[in-house]
Amino acid sequence: MKKSYIIVFLLLFLNCSLLKADDSIDLPKTMVWSTYGLASSSYPEASAFADALMKNYNVRVRLKPSGTGIGRLLPLKKKRVSIAFLGSESFFASEGIYDFAARNWGPQNLRVILARPNTFGIAVPANTDIYKIADLKGKRVAYTTANPSVNVKVEAIMSFADLTWDDVTKTVFPAFTASVKALQTGKVDAVGAVPSGPGVYELAASKKGIRWLDMPKTNTEAWNKLQNIIPFMHPEVETLGAGLSKDNSVELGGYRYPTLTVYADTSEETVYNFIKAIDLSYELFKNITPVMYRWKLDLAVGTPVDAPIHKGTIKYLKEKNLWSEEDEKWNNQRIERLNTLLDGWEKFLEKNIDLTDEDFTSKWLEERKILLAKFLK
């Protein structure tokens, strides 16, 4: 009996210790996050995070879905949400391009908290004569209207072989799903896609099969060209996705999606407590979807990424010995690049206030190229 009391006491003591450790994480009791729409692959991930915070820390999270980058970022800018689950718009916004080249936007001083590793590549049917990126010359390559996230990645990958949209037959589609279906029906020869994304599994399962065009890490010259267009992409070996496995891997473009994003003025302690809470809740959500394991801390941090990493994240990573000198160097250079754009934008606004919206955007994009010339590889 005495032994039983001792065991119960120890269990209670350990439980209290755990609660005390949990109490050291200071989070608001309610949070609102902007996310991709309900049908997206990232919405269930945001939902899993929210459930974990509720179970572990009694934090109620409301998700605010939107199908557009502006719709996800504007609430963050207006401080109606505390965190935005973004895609490549975190890069576009920090750079002041595409939708964010307008005079009411411009470069945004964003910071990344966490970002899941992902890959992107160009897929072709396996029964074609397209084996490498250079073989795309003269072929029909999908271009999706109003989807710069996909299009700029395809453009960057084509630069691997010194190709541009002028060297291929740009085949325009109204939506990404339509372009993937067209690949299956033979109406287009190549599509940029995520290996674990919608549609590509159907192609892999068909008689045509699927082939991913290799992007060898050893081709540093080609990677430099690519990173001049999208500096957040890096070489990555992919084993997960349509037609892929550990025994049939391919080197693709690594990037991060979704990126949990805030503005730079978000407090260090707020971000520190959030990332710590997510890290300590990993066991609760790691099996929710096939890719959730990639939110493990040592995978979901690091560089390169779409925008500089927040100082609160860096503080926690240093405690976990997950922040390297290379990461520090990259982050400092990325902040320098962003500050160059922020300063340049303010000067540009003062000088060009009377321009029409169309001329304003066009002239800003020219100015941006000049500002960033010193960062080209």
Q: Which ranges hold each PLM region?
A:
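Sec/Tat signal peptide C-region and signal peptidase I cleavage site
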Residues: 17-21
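Positively charged n-region of N-terminal signal peptides that target proteins for export
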Residues: 1-4
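An extracytoplasmic/periplasmic, membrane-proximal ligand-sensing/linker region
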Residues: 28, 195-208, 212, 269-271, ...
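Pocket-lining segment of extracytoplasmic ligand-binding domains
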Residues: 88-90, 98-100, 128, 165-167, ...
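Ligand-binding clefts/hinges and TM-proximal coupling segments of bilobed small-molecule sensing domains
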Residues: 140-156, 232-301, 305
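Bilobed "Venus flytrap"/periplasmic-binding protein-like clamshell domains
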Residues: 26-56, 60-62, 119-185, 196-198, ...
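Pocket-flanking alpha-helical
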Residues: 45-52, 62-104, 122, 130, ...
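Bacterial N-terminal signal peptides
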Residues: 7-15
